[in-house]
């Protein structure tokens, strides 16, 4: 697993700072997808190293989705050396993560702990991509973000389960 959890946590802190509406784990995954896509298109590389897979409802982040599912399911780990334990702990060093029970599903809500968004860990180009995407989509619903994924030819033409980014 080659993903930068410190940068992910800081992007979530930035989303909280910018008061992204209805911010839950699904919206975070989609906003990160668009950040990665924007940066790849303009700079030729990803910011975080996350892989995105097409689903029937849009795209999901391979590692982040697994981590969020483990948190939602309140999984207890047998092996403390499991990378996922480290990744989840790193997120929780920056963020309070609360499981919210809805009528038909559960979702994760995030709030800031003591740390503020640290822009020094990003390059100026990475910051431009993050600012652009978050400002563009901060008021967009999860459903509309998912629909936006399908406006991309690469997503539309891929089979479910295929890597799209």
Question: What spans do the regions from the language model cover?
Answer:
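Domain-edge interaction signal
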Residues: 1-165
């Amino acid at each position: 697993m080659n993903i930068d959890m410190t940068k992910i946590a800081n992007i979530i802190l930035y989303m909280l700072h910018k008061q992204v509406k209805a911010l839950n784990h699904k919206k975070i995954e989609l906003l990160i997808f668009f950040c990665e896509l924007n940066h790849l298109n303009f700079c030729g590389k990803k910011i975080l190293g996350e892989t995105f897979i097409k689903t029937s409802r849009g795209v999901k982040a391979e590692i982040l989705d697994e981590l969020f599912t483990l948190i939602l399911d309140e999984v207890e780990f047998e092996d403390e050396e499991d990378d996922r334990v480290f990744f989840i702990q790193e997120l929780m060093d920056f963020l309070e993560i609360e499981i919210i029970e809805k009528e038909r599903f559960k979702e994760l809500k995030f709030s800031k702990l003591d740390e503020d968004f640290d822009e020094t860990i990003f390059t100026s180009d990475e910051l431009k991509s993050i600012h652009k995407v978050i400002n563009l989509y901060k008021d967009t619903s999860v459903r509309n973000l998912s629909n936006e994924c399908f406006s991309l030819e690469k997503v539309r033409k891929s089979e479910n389960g295929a890597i799209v980014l």
